[in-house]
Amino acid sequence: MQKKSLSDIAIQGKRVLMRVDFNVPLDSNKKITDDKRIIESLPSIKKVLENGGRLILMSHLGRPKGKVNADYSLAPVATRLAELLDCPVTMAKECIGTETMQQVLALQDGEVILLENLRFHPEEEANDPDFARELASLGEVYVNDAFGTAHRAHASTEGITHYVQTAVAGFLIERELLYLGKALQEPERPFVAILGGSKISGKIDVLENLFKKVDTVLIGGAMVFTFFKAQGYEIGNSLVEESKIELALKILDEAKNKGIKLLLPVDVIVAPEISATADCHSEMITAIPEEMIGVDIGPLTAEIYRNEILSARTVLWNGPMGVFEIDNFAAGTMAVAQAMAEATAEGATTIIGGGDSAAAVAKAGLANEMTHISTGGGASLEFLEGKELPGIAALND
């Protein structure tokens, strides 16, 4: 999927309206607890400022439900951005209106203003055309660099593109299209997908789409117990989606018919309860005790999965292998992260599909050892499901 990007347009002296994802976590004192998203948007921001553009940034933060709410002001972000850029960042009181327009028109080349939270207006999420038109009037060119909201047709991501001639991708979205897009369209083979998480229902569309592309699928997370139940194994008190047992059998059949190697764990870590203090040990999947809960893949499985990962040229990972937030139940997820890092070092393309997997890789301290970590949660998932993302479809080809 080729889209025009920030590198393809003239910026000098132009008002550049950029949608970024500054939806960062704040503590009770309105201090930013994780500025990763701000840092990720810096390459696009610096490109505009260094090339003499006049930058207007817009974002949402949290869920203020269409009302002005000071708890969700982007002011702390403006402060942090000014520190990171080492230059002043004007904070607008609003994202539309006469005063905002005057501030925008007063910008000089290489200056930047951050508009107030878009979601203070219900029209943003409703993709209201008048609101979109008013936003569009602030800039001469539009750049979308917010992959995390690209799966939503909102005024600032989709509606706005109807009122601008130039609508291009920022560097973050360009990277997502490059890595996620290439993996889905022309992966180097063998292509191994690792899918985890608690529910088959959450991953069924991803599985269906990946079955057209992959050579091998490794399954982990609590969704394995629905497969085991379907195969007639006892699973103790492990999480199971009773309504998805038929579906699990259908998936196993489909993999077989398509010649896809679909691997399930051979052993799992079990515990009497999901708590940080619970004792845990490994059991073969044929011998899960009645009162126990499966919480992670076992060491034998971790080794099998590691070998599969190391034999691949493209590896895509979405969803943890177990309850990795609890250290005692994190070994399987950490082993996969480690194997991915080793595969990267050996020249494979390794892609983390956002969300929990990204958190797991960060917890393992291996975030810099992957080819690409997607910045979108829901957006990455929908992309992997083969769905068109409105915020990306709307950009210039």
Curated annotation (Swiss-Prot):
Which residues are substrate-binding?
D21, F22, N23, R37, H60, L61, G62, R63, R119, R152
Q: Does the keyword Kinase apply?
A: yes
* Gene Ontology cellular component terms for the protein in this record: cytosol
Highest taxon of the source? Bacteria
Q: Which InterPro entries match?
A: Phosphoglycerate_kinase (IPR001576), Phosphoglycerate_kinase_CS (IPR015911), Phosphoglycerate_kinase_N (IPR015824), Phosphoglycerate_kinase_sf (IPR036043)
The catalytic activity of this protein is classed by the Enzyme Commission as 2.7.2.3
**Quick check: keyword Nucleotide-binding in the entry?**
yes
Per the record, the pathway is: Carbohydrate degradation; glycolysis; pyruvate from D-glyceraldehyde 3-phosphate: step 2/5
Q: How does it assemble?
A: Monomer.
- The name this protein carries in UniProt is Phosphoglycerate kinase
Q: Which lineage do the record's taxonomy fields give for this organism?
A: Bacteria, Pseudomonadati, Chlorobiota, Chlorobiia, Chlorobiales
What gene name does this entry carry?
pgk
